UniProtKB/Swiss-Prot annotation:
One of its GO terms (cellular component) is plasma membrane. Required for accurate and efficient protein synthesis under certain stress conditions. May act as a fidelity factor of the translation reaction, by catalyzing a one-codon backward translocation of tRNAs on improperly translocated ribosomes. Back-translocation proceeds from a post-translocation (POST) complex to a pre-translocation (PRE) complex, thus giving elongation factor G a second chance to translocate the tRNAs correctly. Binds to ribosomes in a GTP-dependent manner. The gene is lepA. It is an enzyme of class 3 (hydrolase). InterPro entries: EF-4 (IPR006297), EFG_III/V (IPR035647), EFG_V-like (IPR000640), G_TR_CS (IPR031157), LepA_C_sf (IPR038363), LepA_CTD (IPR013842), LepA_IV (IPR035654), P-loop_NTPase (IPR027417). One of its GO terms (biological process) is positive regulation of translation. Belongs to the TRAFAC class translation factor GTPase superfamily. Classic translation factor GTPase family. LepA subfamily. It is a peripheral membrane protein. This is Elongation factor 4. Its main location: membrane. The lineage of its organism: Bacteria, Bacillati, Chloroflexota, Dehalococcoidia, Dehalococcoidales.
Length: 605
């Protein structure tokens, strides 16, 4: 098929705006799958994706379409995740396309992540086709959403399509818009091969299977190829496309989206975003459009049973094969044994990795409290990165601490502006500006407002999103983007059990919250640690300063139970002996902190 008849496009949307359902209708209406082969969310092949109703990994599928003027087109649809944590996957996908269908829910309007993805598409010069979905729902407010699209994105009403992906309304018109508006790929078939890898997975028989978009030249089975970034060399064992299952083909031409089986044993050798070229006579300049994923959230993952460490290690290796944005390195804790310190794109990413480890590999896990990476400079001038609270130097050794900050966009009905501003202020947010979304965008909740803030990443790590949803009755949406490191006033709080620090309970916190957090920690531990034969002292400390304390009183054995009447000195002698024994026991005794105590402390936000 000629290059002019190829169209590469993706679907971008906020989470749950009907992106995967629209992909299903496009697959069905182009006859790519028979009706009996269809299932809901064809593109979401991972069980977890269907269950949660979200797209986690980018997918690709080739569609054959005959237009109204009887011309045949090859449409390559790349499905993308919508959640903020997976914006890295979105950026890779967008770099492989010429067009994007922007899906906006008729009941919800423009959301924060919709805007983030639109700006990304504009950055890569994609042709954007705006679509209002779910027009069949009773709550659809098309004039309001149309007003938002016009004022925020600048599209007039004539260029916005109205569809119902569920019922198939307006989808034939959308297919026509794709072939008429999305430009054909620009590459040159006579130039040396250049192809962008936008995803990959590990196959036990074929090695790493790389999903790619051919920008120049072509790929044939048996070609000797090289990755320009990594320098890895391999031979193409198989080339093909997705329909949506893998279909082997003799070759992939310029503009095609497909896959190659590389035979490589680790996705680490075949990094997503790299450029593939020929080993001999290959291209000199790699393709642009790649930003490496940067882990923003760190947490420790440990097996509940220490004997399961080897199974966890194998599971982490297998997940790393398919997830380029997951980083992990071994670490050990006196309380939890051996485990891994892992880096994630965000909290949903962490949640999904843990759920996949437990579900796919049948593991029972303990996950430590998530934190961010800090840049710490010692008084001598040496700077280093801290991802684990236990790596933090003593307060008197630290010259400065820097933490990651994010630019936050919150879209909310104007009715909730006050409560949202209070929430952000409580979490150290710095106000930037306010924008109103369109003149027509009014409802009983008031006009919708876009609030811009700068915030420390640690502030939105734990319960911020849940609190935002609960304070706005679910109407607010959130998006954030990393903007750099800024000076931070932070301290490490330690928990001491009988004057012995327990590493697993250490946290990095703002000093103004020290008393509140310290009290909560020792109170929870007092409830969970069983009583001993001697008094146990629990303390929360920053450096040498104790900020909270609780005592677990000793169990008392009645040593004078056998004494009946008689001289008091006999009883006193026994009580003094008991006191001495307890004192000695306290010096040499070791308090076993149960794992349940650790888990209950983790749940404290």
């Amino acid at each position: 098929m000629s290059q002019s008849s190829v169209r590469n496009f993706c679907i971008i949307a906020h989470i749950d705006h009907g992106k995967s359902t629209l992909a299903d209708r496009l697959i069905e209406m182009t006859g790519t799958l028979r009706h009996d082969e269809m299932c809901e969310q064809v593109m979401d092949s991972m069980e977890l994706e269907r269950e949660r109703g979200i797209t986690i990994k980018a997918k690709a599928i080739r569609l054959r379409y005959i237009s109204k003027d009887k011309q045949e087109y090859r449409l390559n649809l790349i499905d993308t995740p919508g959640h903020v944590d997976f914006s890295y996957e979105v950026s890779r996908t967008i770099a492989a396309c010429e067009g994007a269908i922007l899906v906006i829910d008729a009941t919800q309007g423009i959301q924060a992540q919709t805007l983030a993805n639109v700006y990304l598409a504009i950055e890569y010069n994609l042709e954007i086709i705006p679509v209002i979905n779910k027009i069949d729902l009773p709550g659809a407010d098309i004039p309001r959403v149309m007003g938002e699209i016009k004022s925020v994105l600048g599209y007039d009403e004539d260029s916005v399509l109205q569809i119902s992906a569920k019922l198939g309304l307006g989808v034939p018109e959308l297919l026509e818009a794709i072939v008429n508006k999305v430009p054909a790929p620009k590459g040159n078939a006579n130039q040396p091969l250049r192809a962008l890898i936008f995803d990959s997975h590990y196959d036990p028989y074929k090695g790493v299977v790389a999903y790619l978009r051919v920008a120049d030249g072509n790929i044939n089975k048996g070609d000797d190829l090289r990755l320009m970034g990594q320098g890895t060399e391999f031979r193409v064992l198989e080339a093909g496309y997705f329909a949506p299952a893998q279909v082997a083909a003799l070759r992939l031409d310029v503009g095609d989206v497909g896959y190659i089986a590389t035979g490589l044993k680790s996705v680490g050798e075949c990094r997503v975003g790299d450029t593939v070229t020929l080993q001999h006579g290959g291209a000199i300049q790699p393709l642009i459009g790649y930003h490496p994923a940067k882990a923003m959230v760190f947490a420790g993952i440990y097996p509940t049973q220490t004997d399961d460490y080897h199974e966890l290690r194998e599971a982490m290796e297998k997940l790393s094969l398919n997830d380029a944005s997951l980083s992990s390195e071994p670490e050990s804790s006196p309380l939890l044994g051996h485990g891994f310190r892992c880096g994630f794109l965000g909290l949903l990413h962490l949640d999904i990795i843990v759920e996949r480890l437990e579900r796919e590999f049948n593991l029972s896990l303990v996950v430590t409290s998530p934190g961010v990476s800090l840049t710490v400079t010692r008084i001598g001038g040496e700077a280093f990165t801290v991802v684990n609270p236990n790596e933090m130097p003593l307060p008197h050794e630290i010259a400065r601490i820097e933490e990651p900050w994010v630019s936050v966009v919150i879209i909310t009905p104007s009715k909730y502006i006050g409560t949202v501003m209070d929430l952000v202020r409580e979490n150290y947010g710095v106000y930037k500006n306010t924008e109103y979304l369109g003149q027509l965008a009014m409802s009983e909740l008031g006009q919708r407002v876009q609030l811009h803030y700068d915030m420390p990443l640690r502030s939105i790590l734990t319960t911020f999103h849940d609190q935002l949803k609960s304070r706005t009755q679910g109407y607010a949406s959130l998006d954030y983007e990393f903007i750099g490191y800024r000076d931070a006033n932070l301290s490490k709080i330690d928990v001491l059990v009988n004057d012995v620090p327990v590493d697993a309970f250490s946290r990095i916190i703002p000093p103004d919250k020290a008393h509140e957090i310290g009290e909560a920690l020792v109170k929870k531990l007092k409830e969970m640690i069983p009583r001993q034969l001697y008094q146990v002292t629990l303390q929360a400390a920053i450096g040498s300063k104790i900020v909270a304390r609780a005592d677990i009183s000793a169990k008392r054995k009645d040593v004078i139970a056998k004494c009946y009447g008689g001289d008091i000195t006999r009883k006193r002698k026994l009580l003094d002996k008991q006191k001495e024994g307890k004192k000695k026991m306290r010096q040499i005794g070791k308090v076993e902190v149960p794992k349940e105590a650790f888990l209950s402390v983790l749940k404290l936000q």
